[in-house]
């Protein structure tokens, strides 16, 4: 009898143990840890937020301070939320100095934060972040991870740093002044900047800013990322040393523009530019449209080509590289050209004076309707000049030649000391020479042996 009782007790114990070791799906109808829950967590006052982890975060910058988490209970238990100083930190629970990683989850935790006094947000996680109703004198946003950020509101001073792969969608965030730094592959979208825009672009991420009404745009581009701007700005200060392009053809510049290119990146400027200063030292090309400048200066020291269009009162050009200047669409009053390299220069509609000195192999093509042509040719480069002019003064000591078969001058003083030659049509009287309807007159041919005329 005692033996039978012992066997019965042993069988019951074994059955209980088997049940205890069965999978949870058989032991109970639902795992409490996988159930979806919502937690309200207490927070003290804060003005900054630091986010890390794969959470979907929604921030209301006009709501009273609050913190709500929604997700599976096990996930919520592994989220640390703490206020340190003035900063609310939301991140995975740390394990021995490392963040605890959940692994793959079926649902993403949603974190809702009320932050009425919000001034700064730092995003280092992979989750997406929404920030609504931003308002105040200043706001700082740092995107350091793969998570995307979308923000809306209005602020006077906006400071943005993008060093991660996440995109920053800020086109619904109005700002007066914007200071933007791009060091990573993430893209940034802006809109409606009404003050100053300062861009430091060193990464591969692109910037697109629409609807600008800026007083001044300053851009420093050192990486492969592109910058595309539209709207208007009174002033532009651009420096490029990377391979990224500056797409400013849809940005109307109403004041001064400065552009320096030292790399392969291309640039396009447009508007009603009142003053222009450009330098092209790299292989990137420059296009400037809509010039309405009193003065314009251009220095070309590299292989990059330049195209200018519009109107300039006084144009000063130095060409020392292999890049060509195409100013066929530019109307100028006075033009000064110094050619020291293989790059060629094309000018049109010079209305007053053309002062050109050619020392290199680059050629000069120009059309005149003005007072004077002052030309010095010391190299192998040729010059072809058309139109009408009152006075021609030329000195040719190199192998290059002056082709003036299409040029009519009232008076010509040409000296040739080298193997080059010169030709120009000469008529009597400065007044007649300045007329576009006057006959060509006599063709003056000059070489180092002397000069003679033909009909």
Language-model regions: role of each:
Residues 2-10, 19-144, 148-163, 167-183, ...:
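Acidic (Asp/Glu) and glycine-rich low-complexity loops/linkers
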Residues 358, 377:
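Short Lys/Arg-rich basic patches
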Residues 12-14:
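Phosphate-group recognition and catalysis centered on beta-loop-alpha active-site segments
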């Amino acid at each position: 009898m005692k033996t039978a009782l012992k066997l019965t007790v042993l069988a019951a114990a074994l059955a209980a143990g088997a049940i205890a070791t069965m999978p949870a799906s058989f032991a109970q109808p639902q795992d409490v840890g996988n159930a979806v829950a919502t937690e309200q967590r207490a927070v003290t006052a804060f003005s900054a937020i630091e986010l890390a982890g794969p959470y979907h975060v929604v921030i209301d910058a006009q709501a009273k301070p609050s913190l709500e988490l929604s997700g599976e209970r096990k996930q919520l238990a592994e989220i640390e939320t703490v206020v340190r100083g003035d900063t609310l930190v939301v991140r995975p629970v740390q394990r021995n100095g490392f963040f605890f990683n959940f692994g793959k989850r079926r649902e993403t935790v949603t974190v809702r934060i009320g932050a009425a006094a919000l001034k700064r947000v730092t995003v280092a996680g992979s989750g997406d972040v929404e920030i609504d109703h931003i308002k105040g004198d200043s706001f700082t946003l740092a995107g350091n991870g793969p998570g995307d950020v979308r923000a809306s509101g209005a602020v006077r001073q906006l400071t943005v740093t993008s060093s991660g792969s996440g995109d920053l969608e800020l086109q619904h965030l109005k700002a007066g002044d914007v200071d933007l730094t791009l060091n990573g592959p993430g893209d940034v979208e802006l809109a409606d900047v009404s003050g100053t825009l300062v861009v430091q672009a060193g990464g591969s991420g692109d910037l697109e800013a629409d609807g600008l009404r800026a007083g001044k745009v300053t851009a420093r581009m050192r990486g492969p990322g592109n910058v595309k701007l539209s709207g208007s700005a009174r002033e532009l200060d651009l420096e490029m040393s990377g391979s990224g392009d500056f797409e400013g053809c849809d940005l109307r510049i109403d004041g001064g523009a400065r552009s320096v290119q030292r790399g392969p990146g291309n640039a396009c400027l447009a508007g009603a530019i009142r003053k222009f200063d450009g330098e092209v030292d790299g292989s990137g090309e420059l296009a400037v449209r809509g010039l309405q400048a009193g003065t314009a200066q251009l220095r070309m020291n590299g292989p990059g080509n330049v195209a200018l269009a519009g109107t300039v009162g006084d144009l000063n050009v130095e060409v020392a590289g292999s890049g060509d200047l195409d100013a066929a669409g530019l109307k100028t009053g006075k033009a000064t050209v110094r050619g020291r390299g293989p790059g060629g220069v094309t000018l049109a509609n010079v209305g007053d004076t053309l002062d050109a000195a050619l020392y290199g192999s680059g050629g000069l093509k120009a059309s005149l309707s003005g007072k004077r042509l002052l030309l010095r040719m010391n190299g192998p480069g040729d010059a072809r000049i058309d139109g009408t002019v009152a006075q021609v003064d030329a000195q040719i000591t190199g192998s290059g030649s002056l082709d003036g078969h299409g040029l009519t001058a009232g008076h010509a003083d040409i000296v040739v000391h080298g193997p080059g030659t010169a030709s120009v049509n000469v008529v009597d009287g400065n007044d007649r020479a300045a007329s576009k309807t006057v006959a060509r007159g006599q063709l003056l041919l000059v070489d180092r042996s002397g000069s003679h005329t033909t009909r």
